[in-house]
Amino acid sequence: MKARVHVSLKSGVLDPQGKAIGNALASLGFTGIGEVRQGKLIEIELEGSDRAAAQAKVEAMCKELLANPVIENYAIEIG
């Protein structure tokens, strides 16, 4: 079973990498671009087939390591 964790900065938290990407896109001639925010995608291969147990395990991983709950949001997909 595969888990995907999408981590992004909370609204209001400065995102210098997103700002740099936005500036680079503008310098390449792309127009009509508003705010750019960068996040990360983490894929984890899990053993077993119990979706509820997998969700709980990945939730614990997020709280302990994968995301900083003070400045980041995360979303979990189990598939």
Residue ranges and their predicted role:
Residues 1-11, 40-44:
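Short glycine-/aliphatic-rich beta-strand segments at the starts of folded cytosolic domains
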Residues 29, 45, 69:
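Conserved functional loop/turn residues at catalytic and ligand-binding sites
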Residues 12-16, 49-56:
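Short, conserved charged micro-motifs
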